């Protein structure tokens, strides 16, 4: 795994779950007409519609930001290849369950695309279980092509960048978010992140987890199969390069968000999702505010690990 830079570690503020529920509910009420946030037992995530390789989101929760957008933009750095099993060791949780948002490895796939990681990493006496999905542009019709990673590849590699939530995959108490009918401009994730930023100020609070769009549609993007040969120097350049789609519920998203970057050049939110009808990619927001219904499960992380932080950075292409 390319980890030429050292891994940096930062202890996060971990609010009481009941308190965090109140904070999130208050903020979400400004952006959705019908909101309920509560502490509940994590549902069995091995069941549908999730189909994860573990039952829960609990047990030593932590997040990591691996590589970064500067490995993709303005021009790609193809040598930046990482591995989920190695990441689990870097975040001091060998055998962790990892979910989040990243990019597939060009070295493995021979193309570029969006990765929806769902990996139970290897442990002593146990091989890794890779339940990830990936999306690319179908060369035949230019539409979204979503595939199960293990149907095509047998590794746990990824490329360029990822924002990941790692835990022991155990059942336990989590925060359940129900939000319907969006009245504000922010996406569910942006609203939650901004709400925490406003309430916790200088403290950094991070959440990881999964949410379903049960009704409605969402705007996503998928990166082209080929990397840009011309430098992508502005957000407009990036936007014109990406392929945008409207996709339909039910959609299962994995997200990592942090209220405040503690000086580690973090991507403050990143969300990818899949479906069981062949649509998936990088989430922006819903496109059906009057009918959208969200159901999500989240947990605050205790620590953030910054793996292979780019030496030269910028803020282009982080939406």
Swiss-Prot record:
One of its GO terms (cellular component) is nucleus. InterPro entries: C11orf54_DUF1907. Disulfide bonds: none annotated. Zn(2+) binds at residues 270, 272, 282. It is an enzyme of class 3 (hydrolase). It comes from the Eukaryota. It is found in: Nucleus; Cytoplasm. Its EC number is 3.1.-.-. Its cofactor is Zn(2+). GO terms for biological process: DNA damage response; regulation of DNA repair. One of its GO terms (molecular function) is hydrolase activity, acting on ester bonds. CDD domains: DUF1907. It holds the Pfam family DUF1907. Keywords: Cytoplasm, Hydrolase, Metal-binding, Nucleus, Zinc. Exhibits ester hydrolase activity on the substrate p-nitrophenyl acetate, in vitro. May regulate DNA damage and repair by regulating HIF1A degradation via chaperone-mediated autophagy (CMA). Monomer. This is Ester hydrolase C11orf54 homolog.
